[in-house]
Curated annotation (Swiss-Prot):
Organism: Arabidopsis thaliana (Mouse-ear cress)
EC id: 2.4.1.-
Gene Ontology terms describing biological process: protein glycosylation
Protein name: Probable beta-1,3-galactosyltransferase 3
Coiled coil: none
Amino acid sequence: MSTKIKGELFPSRSLVSKKWTFLLCFGSFCFGILFTDRMWIIPESKDMPRPSVSTEAERLKLISEGCDPKTLYQKEVNRDPQALFGEVSKTHNAIQTLDKTISSLEMELAAARSAQESLVNGAPISNDMEKKQLPGKRRYLMVVGINTAFSSRKRRDSVRTTWMPSGEKRKKLEEEKGIIIRFVIGHSATAGGILDRSIEAEDKKHGDFLRLDHVEGYLELSGKTKTYFSTAVSKWDAEFYVKVDDDVHVNIATLGETLVRHRKKHRVYLGCMKSGPVLSQKGVRYHEPEYWKFGENGNKYFRHATGQLYAISRDLASYISLNQHVLHKYANEDVTLGAWFIGLDVTHIDDRRLCCGTPPDCEWKAQAGNICVASFDWTCSGICRSADRIKEVHKRCGEPENAIWKARF
């Protein structure tokens, strides 16, 4: 076969004849039809449900069982109000149980973070902490931290001979009643100096100190309080943590009985609640350098527990431990603690038995059967000349000597 171009003949360059072209096209067409039919055929399955029939059957089943939407609505309208109230109560109880569980988990998380922080900072975890992390750990009722200073040796001795059990009795108090009592003190500006060595010798004799990683100083009481709660909650697992000054008389059994009444409550902040003026004038006692944060001159502080004695529950102590690096400190320690809680959902409990006066006030109340938890003189922010007078206060206002051993917590 040839092709004529401009009068010349050339041989054909077609490689495929018309016959072969026709056969290839026809074969491709047939293959395409076969493939298309295979793709679009829907296989019949015995297991595949028929939507319309199944939906109708389920609807009929629901109606037969009394679950028709109209029937359910009518039941809700005609339901007994008392039954509804019962269900609401059950739901409320379930929510409370869940809230307790969440609080427990939060406390365990805070304790775990405190332990982790101790490891990161290179501080060894105490034996008490190790025991606390084991299954069946000991839960104490309360930890009582007695705030003291290097110069208060006479006050400490007077406390040991009055309301604070010493020696074997103190150990028995811990084992049988779950009450920990310690004098709380940090270290001097020159660590390892004569003041620190004096405390170490006293602690070796009595074994009743809780040493803090804190530099002692009157203007550092807010920081000391924060460090105390953070240290105590990581060292002992207790329901309550108490702070008291070393010039205050305390009836331990009455304190324990008071706290037990609030053990089912969450985020407890207990003390003698007060509100005083914000002092902006320099040079006066209780001057507040950041007075401008509390509003105009003449304003008063928000309600907070007086600093002589107060108690907080474990969840609040854990909160302080967890957030200690961001909690702001004001000049006055009791105001500072109240400020940490002012924005939280805290249960404030005002109990005036925590701030009785010295005799005759606390004596009259004791004779009437209303024994005070704590006694001190407001004019001195503690018992005036406490080292000399606390024995008299204990004699006239103290609970019976065996009260703590008869108490059930």
